[in-house]
Amino acid sequence: MPPLPRSQFLETRDGIRLHALVWRAGEVHTDRVESPVVLLHGGGANAHWWDHLANALSTRQPVYALDFRGHGDSEYPESRHVGAFNDDLEDFVGWLAREDVILIGHSMGAAVALDHASRFPATRALVLVDLARGGNPTTGRRARLALSLRRTYRTRAEAIERFRFLPESSHASEALRAVIGGQSVREEANGRFGYKFDPAWFSLPSRPRPDLAALLCPTLLVRGSESLLLTSDAALAFAREVATARLVEIAEAGHHVLVDQPERLLAEIASFVATLPAATNSSSS
């Protein structure tokens, strides 16, 4: 049986309690200094969306999956501001005391990872899984609208049964949907059951895009071949603009590549990481 993650909590600069899952920190012994991997979920998701991938990623280095504020088992603050998730990641990397992280983000998490790497050149590598760019605006608006509505259910079982990926996924297995759904439900104060994210975050405007010219680390952009949120043209334009970027497209996958084709995604990440130069222990000051 693969090892289970442990939970870790830390406090941000503004006093918010963040939760992260940790795989094998302090247990990996190799003859190389390996950078920590930090997994970043998309909007309305949580750290457990990475459970089925994290053990395979943690064979040579520790792996952390962060719950952004207002998501998962992190604190749900009353006040919200643009850039809060970016601050969460910056504080988390500071807590790790290692700047040379390998950031792997999906959707919103990819956008946060991209922003961080463009501002912190010690970032060792970046994997952007279906970063939303140039996609169908109607699909994007519908997904944001659906996420902005708070739905609750009478029982936990009903909430798990009604759990869906947004945008809808036609390739994810029913078993994986149910497992992630089970990790995405929480009991509300009124005794009903809802999902582990605060819908109010989806009414905020987007943070300005980072300067891609400032991105220096090796970067892998992964596009689902059927994605409606990252077009082929936008992915190609990104790869042309970022000198350190490599683009791969995974067949039979939509926006949620990590649940549609997890084994293929793992293979692409492993191939990419194998090309990285040897790490050095770059500690935060």
Predicted features, each with a name:
Residues 253-262, 266:
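Catalytic histidine-centered segment of alpha/beta-hydrolase-like enzymes
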Residues 187-241, 249:
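Conserved serine/cysteine hydrolase catalytic core
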Residues 13-16, 21-27, 52-55, 64, ...:
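Active-site loop/oxyanion-hole signature of alpha/beta-hydrolase fold enzymes
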Residues 105, 109, 113:
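Gly/Ala-rich beta-loop-alpha elbow adjacent to hydrolase catalytic centers
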Residues 42-52:
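Serine-hydrolase catalytic-loop signature spanning alpha/beta hydrolases and amidase-signature enzymes
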Residues 154-211:
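Conserved alpha/beta-hydrolase catalytic His-Asp/Glu region
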Residues 1-37, 59-61, 98-99, 270-285:
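Alpha/beta-hydrolase fold catalytic core
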Residues 114-115, 124-156:
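Flexible "cap/lid" loop of the alpha/beta hydrolase fold
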